[in-house]
Amino acid sequence: MNSLIMVIIALIAAYFIGSTPAPYLAGRIFKKIDIRTVGSKNMGSMNVFYNVGFWPGILVLTTDIGKGALAMAVANWLGEGLGIQMLCALMAIAGHNYPVWLKFKGGKGGATAIGILAYMMPEGIPIYIACFLILMAITRFPTLSYGISFISFILVAWLGQHDMGKVLFSLLVVMIPILMYIPRMKEIKNKAGSGNAKRAIFRRNLKERL
């Protein structure tokens, strides 16, 4: 088959893999709610944890992480090189953030970004997990913890693999969810006030949903 056609197939497949609306489906299946209308109204795993339940949240988190890895794996299976695999990774994030099934209103791409970087640099997974757990223990702030922990993959690409291409790509992948989250952070701060912003972002009753 023509190589250009294979590239197009890989990119389209990546978008539709990314657009699988796991948070929306979890809300409908487990609680008969539209996740876009409760909590933060975000199509992400944290909103599912808080408003649907712990195990549905784990399922959604695993699915969203898997979407990023699967998009790259499919491109690899189709015989595409790392450059096309990276483009497919970005298409998976685009699908997650702008799913055609939900009028292009999706999540922010954080979990999908984790899957992408974990697929590219599996040796960074234990470092990422360790960083996340340490930061969570210190800050009790999940969004901040997983965001800062992304640095572990960037360091693996830079110091471990000495691959500047992967470093730059990792930075791009990490910046997408960060930029997507800025409006939400401003909204929370404006509603809660600076003194209560952290409490509003992270509700400590997650254990009650076990």
UniProtKB/Swiss-Prot annotation:
Subcellular localization(s) per the UniProt record: Cell membrane
Which pathway or pathways does this protein act in? Answer: Lipid metabolism; phospholipid metabolism
Residue spans crossing the bilayer: 4-24, 52-72, 73-93, 114-134, 141-161, 163-183
Membrane topology per record: Multi-pass membrane protein
Which EC numbers characterise this protein's activity in its record? 2.3.1.275
Q: Name one GO cellular component term.
A: plasma membrane
SMART domains tied to this protein: G3P_acyltransf (SM01207)
Source superkingdom = Bacteria
What terms describe the molecular function in GO for this protein?
acyl-phosphate glycerol-3-phosphate acyltransferase activity
| InterPro entries noted in UniProt | G3P_acylTferase_PlsY (IPR003811)
Broad class of enzyme this protein falls into: transferase
Q: Which Pfam families match?
A: G3P_acyltransf
Catalytic activity reported: an acyl phosphate + sn-glycerol 3-phosphate = a 1-acyl-sn-glycero-3-phosphate + phosphate
Which BP terms from GO are recorded? phospholipid biosynthetic process
Give the UniProt keywords, A-Z: Cell membrane, Lipid biosynthesis, Lipid metabolism, Membrane, Phospholipid biosynthesis, Phospholipid metabolism, Transferase, Transmembrane, Transmembrane helix
Its annotated function is as follows: Catalyzes the transfer of an acyl group from acyl-phosphate (acyl-PO(4)) to glycerol-3-phosphate (G3P) to form lysophosphatidic acid (LPA). This enzyme utilizes acyl-phosphate as fatty acyl donor, but not acyl-CoA or acyl-ACP.
What does the subunit section of this Swiss-Prot or TrEMBL entry state? Probably interacts with PlsX.
What family, per the record? Answer: Belongs to the PlsY family.
Protein name according to UniProt: Glycerol-3-phosphate acyltransferase 2
* Taxon lineage: Bacteria, Bacillati, Chloroflexota, Dehalococcoidia, Dehalococcoidales
